[in-house]
Each structure stands twice: as C-alpha cells, then as structure tokens.
C-alpha cells in the first residue's frame, strides 16, 4: 500500500479502498473540482505562472510541460521548464489581460475563417501587406510563448519553494535569433544539410544558424547537469516532409491556419509560415546548461529528427553513453542513440561532446517479448513491415523521386519498394555526411523503411535504478494520416483490434548493457477500465521513477474528451460508443503511483488530478524525495475562462470493477479559473511544487 490514502476519482478502481458491494452507492454521484486535488496531508505551492517575470525583460511562457530541477546545492538550483504550445482559445481570450499587449487576434481570426479552407499563405504576401504583418505579429507572440524558461529556486525555512531571481534566469524561445542574434547551434551530420547553399527544397540562407525552439514537450536531465529538451509536434508549425537531399518542403506547404469548429480544440497552426522557418531545423533534441547564462541551446542531430518525447539517459563510467527517446505519433518508434566514445565520469560536462558522434537506432519488437536495434545508416537494408501487420493496415514510406512520404496499404507494394531501394542510402542523396544527415532528418520514415516496429505513441522513457527502461505508450488507436501500431505487439485485452487506453512497458537490454543490440520486453501496466483488465487510467504519458523504483505517472487524455457525457455505451444506431469517446468516463487528467516491487507491484493508486481541461505534466522529484514538481498545462483549453463559476450535470454509464453497469450523475465545471480560483479569473499554465504538509518524503 502507498503511504497515502488514494484520491477518489470518478471511476471505481481496485485500489480505491471501496468494497465491491459499496461501489455503486459510493460512485453514483461525483463532483469534479477545478483544482489540483491531492491526498489528505499533501499540499502544493505555485512557483511560476504564464506571464510572470523572467530575467530583466522576459516573461514565463505558456503551456509548461517537462521540468527539471538542476540542484546546485541542497534544496536550491535551477528549474528548467519547457513550454510546448499555445492553446488558442484561452491564450487569445486572456493575452491582453495577462501580458498587457494588444494583438490583432480578432482581425486575423476573421480573415482566416473567410479564407479557403481557413488557410492563409502569409509567406506569399508582400512584406508591407497589413494582413501579413498581423499574422507575423501573432505568430511571433505565439512562438515567444513556446520554448524554455530557466528560473532559479530554493526551498525556504518553511519548506516552501520560492524563486530567487538569479542573473542566469532567462528565456530561450521560438523566436530566439529572429531579431536578437541568439541563434541556437547544432552538431552532427544534419548540420551539413543545413549548410547547403542550394538543394531541392527551401533554404533559409542562415546556414547552420537556427532560429528558436518550439513545441517543447518532454525532456530528460543528464547526470552532468544539463537538460535535454524535446521538440515534439513541430509538424503543426513548419513543414515536416523533406526531399531526398534532406532539404525542406516550401513554406507554402504549411500555411497559417486558425482551426476552430464544433467539437474541435481551437488551434493556431503554421506559425513558421510568416516567420520563414526552415522545417528541417525543427524536431530535434536541444541541450541546455541552465547555470551558464550565455547558453541558448544546441540541437544534437545524431539523436534524430522526429516528434521527440522524454529521454532515458544511461551514463555509466567505462561504457558508451545511451539516450532513449520515443516519437509521439501513432506509429512512432522507440529510438536509442549510442555514442562512439565512452563515459569517463558521469558527472563531467565533457559528456556533452559524446552527443556529437555516435549512431541512432530504432527498435524492432518481436511478439515473443524479444527485440533488436536497427541502425539508421546508409548501408542498412530496406525491409519495411507489411501494411497488414498494423492495426490500421497502412504504413508510410519515403516517396521518391517527389520527396515527402506516401501511404502504402497494399502488401504487394512492399516487395516492389524493396526491389527499387536496397538500402537506406538508396533513398537519400548527397555525400556520405549529407546522406547520413538526410536519414536523421527523415528519421521516422527512414525507420519505417528499415523495418523498425510501429508502436503506440511512445511518450516518456525513464531509467529505473537497476537500469531497466520503462516506456509509456499512450494510445493504441490508428490514424489515417500517421499510421498505427503493430497489432501483434500492442494487443487489446478484450480482443478488439485496437486499444486506445495505453500501456507501460518494461525493457531490459541484454546483459544490462546500454549499448546492447538486443533486448527483452514485457507490458507491466495496462490502461483501461478494471472490468477489462485495465488499472483505471487512460493514456499514460510522463513518468518519474523515485529512489525506491516506484513509478509516478500522469495521463494525457485529449482535452475534448474530458468528462464528455456518456449516458449510454450504445449509440442510437445500435453500435458501440468508441473507445476514444468512452474516455469521458475517466474525468480529468490524473496523477498515479505504481509500485514496481513488493506485494503491491503493478497496482495503480490515484495520487490526484488536475484542474479543468488541463494536463498535469513533467513530474520531477527533488533529490531528497520531499517535493514533486508538476507543470499544470492548458487549464481551460477547451472551454476557456470559466464564467461565473458555471457547471453542468452530466450522466455517465459507469461500471464496477467486476463489470456491473450503473449510472453516475457528475457535476462538471465548464472552463477553468485555475490557479487564481476566483470567479472569472484567467486560466494560466503554472508550475507547482507538491509536498507533504509535515515535510516528510512523499512516499
């Protein structure tokens, strides 16, 4: 049992402490709170919120995600905080109120709504065109609110974490370098592609200088005190596809777009269009040294370009450095970078140089629980899995000679593809370094061509004290655009063709060697309802492993599914409500504690849940294990500001842990006022420190 009384969520679970015969009476009514709800005896302090001052002239960004405390002394150090994206509805509703600046939001939104398909190619407009200038201003503000915040903090005598405002406090944003000269640097083979003076695609003329970093979702902290920051859903900001030489598709291929519609999450896409961003410079791993006020980030291209999530880092003396990461897309791969050189002292900052040379591998999972690593290099054979091996019956492969990708649904087409292209090098052009760079730039599609296993949205990757790797696979559903997981590896417990609710996998390298080329794997936790064998959560996302090996996990259900009414599990036409829409049963995104050893191993205990429309992200434990830092992202994303404490009563067709159906009446706040929690307060993404009131370790 955990050292806390689990929080009661909306769904009966085996670990709730409510006996089977009392579940219907105990769960027939439920009230959701617009707050961070924690067990009795725990509290939280707000450290920083969107709009707070950073340095002399900057402000804390939007949608904080991964965070890391790099301690420079006991209970003192730097918080490195990612800012993933902006949530268009609450961001545009409250920007002037919070930031104090007027943006031409209404005019541009109206223009986008009136444009064909809601899209405007601002890059094709004249520089002095008023519409282009307005789109530029909004895109610049949105990109500024992404990136990274570095703030100094310490725990005071009362046990409360507070900011100390050091000279190293700073922002690295999506527009760093655009006007201030603070370009990001790069290492590795893709730099040779960035330096091309001419090529098949768009070239920004900046060579290896890179403007900014954006879509910064998850990350990882190195033993030597730097932070690896991911660039995830860059494909919504800049063109993802590339040509065979690794150069980018034109700016016009991803116009500016203001997405809005019934049942949709409002979004502002194509922000790189007006700003002139070269697509192949985004989707990388950025290394930051928080204590160096002059460090504005380095993109290490040997780690590949894809929709990066968290990093599992193994740095052991006398061994090669190993960095794991997942590509968070439906059909995304698990990757491993292995350095050419070896680690001498895991705490030496010289280890950053090891990220500049090595090899990137993608995982091949076998259904029998074994697997191997496939090198993404020019002489690797082309050998993709068949489309029919996947849940959705489709795989995406590099398209030649046109560039970009093509969807393949016919098993017979794979043989023809292999006949035409024998190795990965046949799919890309340039000298040896440029060709390797192009493979890394196109990592996901190169990995598909090489036969790496398409998986179920791999999000966080974390290393346990014994060297085991834990991976959160968020969702096993298919996508008509991206693809889907391998159906013999990612199986639904109910016999259905796909499983939306996710898994947590444990992977052990052969001989526990970070550089091993083979491994074993097993699923150790399953999302879903208890009656189906699940643990009561949906869509596991970020992981944090404590000193005892226990997993702290947060969920990432799509905001539009939170508390969506499920009055019946059968639709009016007699068909079943989809797994995706059943996620309304699970309430808000939540926080869980999962022991990995002892009598409670593999059980999941709810530690809490977040405010309305939010995702609780970036769990990070202080070295003394007394503080859990969390980033509360996008409160109010779907409904915006909660007006006059509005709420609705909704019906949910719930099930007990043994499958008996009953109806739950649930009161649901509409929108959010967190963290202020006063009527009509603007919802603001914020970083919090969770602690026990008595100051003891969390668990």
Task: Briefly describe each language-model feature range.
Residues 2-699:
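Conserved small-residue
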């Amino acid at each position: 049992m955990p050292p806390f009384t689990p929080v009661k969520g909306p769904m009966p679970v085996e670990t709730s402490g409510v006996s089977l015969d009392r579940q219907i009476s105990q769960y027939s009514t439920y009230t959701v709170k617009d707050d961070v709800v924690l067990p009795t005896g725990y509290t939280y302090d707000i450290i920083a919120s969107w709009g707070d001052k950073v340095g002399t002239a900057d402000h804390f960004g939007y949608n904080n995600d991964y965070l890391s405390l790099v301690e420079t002394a006991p209970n003192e150090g730097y918080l490195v905080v990612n800012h993933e994206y902006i949530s268009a509805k609450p961001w545009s509703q409250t920007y002037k109120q919070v930031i104090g600046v007027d943006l031409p939001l209404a005019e541009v939104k109206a223009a986008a709504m009136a444009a064909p398909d809601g899209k405007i190619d601002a890059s094709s407009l004249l520089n002095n065109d008023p519409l282009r200038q307005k789109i530029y201003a909004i895109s610049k503000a949105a990109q500024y609110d992404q990136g990274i915040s570095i703030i100094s903090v310490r725990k005071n005598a009362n046990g409360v974490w507070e900011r100390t405002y050091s000279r190293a406090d700073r922002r690295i944003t999506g527009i760093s370098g655009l006007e201030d000269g603070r370009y990001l640097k790069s290492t590795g083979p893709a730099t040779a592609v960035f330096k091309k003076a001419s090529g098949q695609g768009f070239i920004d003329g900046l060579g290896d200088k890179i403007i900014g970093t954006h879509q910064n979702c998850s990350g990882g902290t190195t033993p030597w005190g730097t932070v690896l920051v991911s660039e995830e859903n860059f494909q919504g900001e800049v063109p993802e596809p590339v040509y065979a030489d690794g150069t980018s598709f034109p700016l016009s291929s991803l116009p500016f777009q203001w997405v809005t519609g019934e049942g949709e999450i409002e979004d502002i896409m194509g922000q790189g269009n007006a700003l002139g961003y070269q697509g192949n410079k985004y989707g990388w791993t950025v290394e930051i040294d928080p204590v160096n006020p002059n460090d504005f980030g380095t993109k290490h291209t040997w780690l590949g370009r894809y929709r990066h999530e968290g990093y599992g880092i193994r740095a052991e003396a006398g061994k090669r450095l190993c960095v794991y990461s997942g590509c968070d897309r439906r059909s995304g791969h698990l990757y491993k970078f292995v350095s050419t050189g070896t680690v001498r002292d895991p705490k030496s900052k010289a280890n950053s140089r090891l990220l500049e040379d090595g090899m990137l591998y993608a995982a091949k999972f076998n259904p029998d629980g074994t697997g191997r690593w496939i090198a993404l290099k020019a002489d690797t054979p082309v050998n993709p899995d068949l489309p029919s091996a996947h849940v959705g019956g489709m795989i995406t492969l590099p398209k030649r000679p046109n560039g970009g990708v093509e969807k393949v649904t016919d098993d017979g087409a794979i043989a023809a593809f292999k006949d035409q292209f024998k190795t990965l090098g046949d799919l890309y052009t340039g000298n040896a370094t440029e060709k390797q760079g192009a493979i890394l730039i196109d990592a996901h599609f190169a990995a598909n061509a090489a036969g790496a296993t398409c998986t179920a949205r791999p999000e966080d990757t974390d290393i346990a004290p014994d060297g085991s790797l834990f991976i959160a696979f968020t969702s096993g559903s298919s996508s008509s655009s991206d693809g889907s997981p391998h159906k013999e590896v990612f199986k639904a417990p109910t016999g259905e063709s796909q499983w939306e609710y996710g898994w947590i996998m444990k992977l052990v390298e052969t001989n526990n060697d970070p550089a091993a080329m083979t491994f074993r794997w097993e699923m150790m936790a399953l999302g879903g309802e208890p009656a189906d064998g699940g643990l009561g959560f949906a869509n596991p996302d970020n992981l944090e492993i404590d000193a005892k090996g226990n997993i702290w996990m947060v969920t990432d259900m799509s905001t539009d599914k939170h508390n969506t009414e499920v009055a019946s599990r059968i639709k009016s036409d007699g068909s079943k409500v989809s797994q995706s829409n059943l996620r309304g049963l699970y309430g808000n995104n939540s926080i869980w504690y999962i022991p990995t050893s002892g009598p409670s191993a593999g059980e999941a205990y709810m530690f809490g849940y977040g405010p309305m429309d939010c995702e609780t992200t970036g769990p990070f434990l202080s070295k003394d294990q007394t503080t859990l830092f969390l980033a509360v992202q996008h409160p109010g994303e779907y409904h915006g500001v909660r007006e006059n404490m509005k709420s609705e009563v909704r019906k949910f067709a719930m099930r007990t842990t043994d499958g008996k159906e009953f109806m739950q009446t649930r009161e649901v706040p509409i929108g959010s006022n967190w963290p202020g929690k006063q009527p009509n307060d603007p919802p603001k993404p914020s970083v919090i420190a969770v602690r026990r009131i008595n100051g003891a370790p969390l668990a």
